[in-house]
Amino acid sequence: MMFAYIVAVVSALALTSAYPTGAPSSTCVSMRPGHLADPQPLPAPYTISTPVNTMKAGDSIEVTISGNTPDDFFRGILLQARQGDNIVGKWTVKDDFSKLLDCGEPDNAVTHANSVDKTTVSYIWTAPEDFVGDVVFLVTIVKVYETFWVAIPSAPVTVLSHK
C-alpha cells in the first residue's frame, strides 16, 4: 500500500514538472527540459532545414523542423540560433503551436505554446544587422515526457556582411 502511494506521488511530481505551455527561460543555457529522464542519443529522428546555407546580416530565413517519418511527432520544442555558446538573432512564429521566449534578449528563442502533436513546424529567423559568421540552429525536441533529444544541431548557415 505504501509503495503504491509513493509511486502515485512520484508520478504526480513528474507530470507537474513538465512544461505543456512552453519551456521556461531557466532552460535557455542547457536546453534540457528538466524531465526526470535521460535524453535520447543523437542522431534524432528529426531534421532542421533551411532553404539556403548562406545569407546576409539583417536578412531573414525560414527554419523548418520536421520528423523523418509520420510517426516522428513531437509535443515540445526549444529552438535557438547560436554562434558558439551565444544565442543570436530574433525569431518570428507563424502558428498557434509556438511562442517566443526571452533567453537573455527578447524573441531570441522559440518554444511550444501547447502540447499538441506536430510533425512539422517552421519559423522565421532574422540575423542581427551587425552579425557576420556561422550560426547553427539548435533544437531540443520532446516527443513525450520521457522521450526527448537535447540540442539537435542543424548544418551551419553562414551570415555575410550586408554591405
From Swiss-Prot:
GO terms for cellular component: extracellular region; membrane. CDD domains: Reeler. Pfam families: Reeler. Residues 19-163 form the Reelin domain. Its main location: secreted. The keyword Transcription regulation does not apply. One of its GO terms (biological process) is defense response to bacterium. It is found in: Secreted. Residues 1-18 form the signal peptide. It comes from the Eukaryota. Belongs to the insect defense protein family. May have antimicrobial activity. This is Putative defense protein 3.
